[in-house]
């Protein structure tokens, strides 16, 4: 019995020691240290809607309000989305359906929406008039598109009938039902406003915001209409060389200005679970001869599996102007998401990252924020919006 007891004690001691010994095979992971942070309003949730462009740009403007010394405010996303749907509908009908009518958009839609229609706080116009507490456009977008297509079908050349005078009223009635009637006046923090007077009360100037991009199919230092499906408004961007576009971003952040960021997250280097974006490259120089030879024999899938583990920092691609252009021309870079760059950070290896506020709710691992490497931002930026005073 004594011998058995001693054996059990020895086993338990060995087990405890093993449990306390670090697992040297465990993934190192990414460890970020924030360097520069710009104050922002809380992370929002676009939920089941393709309105990142609105959520991100309004968060960007809310950050600008804070920077200018204003009080925190949650601006109504659905106020802008609803007005934008109406303007999209008018252009869709005018173009005989030969233009994009969808949930997507761009930062310029928001600033022009405020210019034309004012803005209201979220409390005055939540815009969820269909039984949910968050945005859900699964039904709405289908209803709107079907209505517009029916209007056009009823007025084709073969029927020899003009558009009815009722179609805009009918479309607006649908918007009223889903978003709720728009207030002409409202009370906010004890004071009565109209959408226009509320916009005027904010310590920002809509004319201060400009869009910048970097592509070679248009001359540098000129403006051009960026050719992406969600640019239904045909908004223009200033075209700068890549290094100058990146300098604009860096200078803005260094001086306390957030940056509204249009980008592409349909990439293998974008991880939803790790909340990072990278452009990994094989470190061939760091490989021995046998290792390099073995790498060369791997299939593309095997190489991708090795590169996109997101287990620790590694070598990334050096992004060139030509690489950006090729990716844009062949559809590898698309305009599929908008966020706000609001800080900088480094990983444990000293690599530079941008800290980004997303609109996918507060979620792990960084409470709704993401980290994107400098190569990712250089490679996958479609456009940025900045305050012109940050240049």
Regions from the language model: what does each represent?
Residues 27-231, 235-260, 354, 364-366:
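Active-site nucleophile-adjacent alpha helix/oxyanion-hole segment immediately C-terminal to the catalytic cysteine
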């Amino acid at each position: 019995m004594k011998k058995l007891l001693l054996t059990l004690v020895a086993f338990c001691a060995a087990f405890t020691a093993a449990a306390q010994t670090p697992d040297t095979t465990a993934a190192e992971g990414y460890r970020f240290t924030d360097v520069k942070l710009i104050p922002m309003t809380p992370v929002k949730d676009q939920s089941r809607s393709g309105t990142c462009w609105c959520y991100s740009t309004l968060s960007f403007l809310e950050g600008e309000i804070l920077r200018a010394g204003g009080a925190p405010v949650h601006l109504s996303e659905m106020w802008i989305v609803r007005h934008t749907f109406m303007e999209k509908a008018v252009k869709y009908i005018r173009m005989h359906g030969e233009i994009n009518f969808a949930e997507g958009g761009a930062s310029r839609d928001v600033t022009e929406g405020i210019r034309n229609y004012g803005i209201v706080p979220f409390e005055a116009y939540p815009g969820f008039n269909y039984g949910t507490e968050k945005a859900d456009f699964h039904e709405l977008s289908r209803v709107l598109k079907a209505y517009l297509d029916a209007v056009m079908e009823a007025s084709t050349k073969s029927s020899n009938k003009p558009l009815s005078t009722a179609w805009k009223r009918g479309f607006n009635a649908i918007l009223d039902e889903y978003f709720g009637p728009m207030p002409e006046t409202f009370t906010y923090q004890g004071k009565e406003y109209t959408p226009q007077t509320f916009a005027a009360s904010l310590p920002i100037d809509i004319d201060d915001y400009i869009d910048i991009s970097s592509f070679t199919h248009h001359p540098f230092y000129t403006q051009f209409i960026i050719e992406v499906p969600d640019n239904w408004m045909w908004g223009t961007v200033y075209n700068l060389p890549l290094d100058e576009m990146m300098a604009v971003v860096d200078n803005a952040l260094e001086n306390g200005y957030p940056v509204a960021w249009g980008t592409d997250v349909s990439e293998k280097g974008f991880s939803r679970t790790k909340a990072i974006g990278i452009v990994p490259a094989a470190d061939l120089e760091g490989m021995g001869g046998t290792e390099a030879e073995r790498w060369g024999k791997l299939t593309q899938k095997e190489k991708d599996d090795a590169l996109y583990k997101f287990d620790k920092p590694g070598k990334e691609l050096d992004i060139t102007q030509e690489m950006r252009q090729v990716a844009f021309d062949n559809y590898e870079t698309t305009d599929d998401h908008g966020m706000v760059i609001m800080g900088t950070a480094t990983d444990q290896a000293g690599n530079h990252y941008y800290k980004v506020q997303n609109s996918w709710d507060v979620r792990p691992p960084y409470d709704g924020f993401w980290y994107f490497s400098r190569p990712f931002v250089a490679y996958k930026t479609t456009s940025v919006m900045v305050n012109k005073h940050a240049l």
